[in-house]
């Protein structure tokens, strides 16, 4: 039976989103949440937000607004896992367990931490000025978010790929130190076609440019903002270019292909900017009006949102987080002292039941793996690899090997007698 793919999406609680957030992130994520071949996890990263936001009222308000936004846009908490990061305390306990195997050198190379230090040096400040331990440890908390549910895939932007690689590294280190594959190694999913919208001034829509159109702006405010979009001086009756037109790009993001083609023809026919803006306003409002109504209803009943988030967290803890933490606590030795004598025998027996691949990182920075048989005898040793993914891909190929020729792969130190290796691989396939 094939395992369902678990997909984890983190949501930054940054308040009410704008149209660019909706088109580029929220709408496609909610569409993806309906996939029947995946188990989807969506969480509000309120603990992460504390790294930058230290205004309690703002943190609370932003969390409420972003939760209401996603629910209003169609996220169904009965079909996906929707929860608040701080409602799953096992995440922070796991963070500590990972911290105890994470290399400080890896954290030193984290982009956000390095950027903060570089900025301080450029300004003549002490390189750690204003840099909190929270910023430094951010990648470990992100790894815990992913590994607490053993997510297989994590949709991220290119600037977050490093954090997924770190999560893989921490997971491999833990698996190696404690001799068992407790964690699945997650993969980053990069959407190369992320939609971006132009703002009121033609630049990318961004709060930092102060050129946004709030997603749930009241109807009249929405109309006013649309009519303030920057256009050129071409008069009614004069053909207008769709290329580079913020007005046209915004319309295209909400319209069907047929509607877009008709709008393009209207540009060629010399539609006035006022009429074009009116059409854009009506097309956006057609999609947004029902979402706005749901958002306003949700914001009027914050207790319902609170109940939804708490219920999601409670169900997740029971299903995934609590059982995994119990297993991990036992693995590291945080055990009931009265059961010490009886626990040693069975644990050893279970551990020795099957052959096992062990992945690890050496001091040279390279990633290696070994194959041991059920008794712990070393059967196979790899060469070093530049990334954990390369090592993992080779292990996957080895697990399918059924004869000696299939074992002859670059990066594998094959023993003279390959029969024990093939027997071990067969045992793993049949397990």
UniProtKB/Swiss-Prot annotation:
Which keywords does the record carry? Aminoacyl-tRNA synthetase, ATP-binding, Cytoplasm, Ligase, Nucleotide-binding, Protein biosynthesis
| Organism, scientific name | Xanthomonas campestris pv. campestris (strain ATCC 33913 / DSM 3586 / NCPPB 528 / LMG 568 / P 25)
Residue window of motif 'HIGH' region: 13-21
Protein name (database record): Tryptophan--tRNA ligase
According to the UniProt record, one GO cellular component term is: cytosol
- Motif 'KMSKS' region location, chain numbering: 204-208
Query: Which enzyme class?
Result: ligase
Reaction(s) catalysed (UniProt annotation):
tRNA(Trp) + L-tryptophan + ATP = L-tryptophyl-tRNA(Trp) + AMP + diphosphate + H(+)
> Lineage in the entry?
Bacteria, Pseudomonadati, Pseudomonadota, Gammaproteobacteria, Lysobacterales
EC number(s) stated in the UniProt entry for this protein: 6.1.1.2
Function text: Catalyzes the attachment of tryptophan to tRNA(Trp).
Its GO biological process annotations read: tryptophanyl-tRNA aminoacylation
- Binding residues annotated for L-tryptophan, in chain numbering: 145
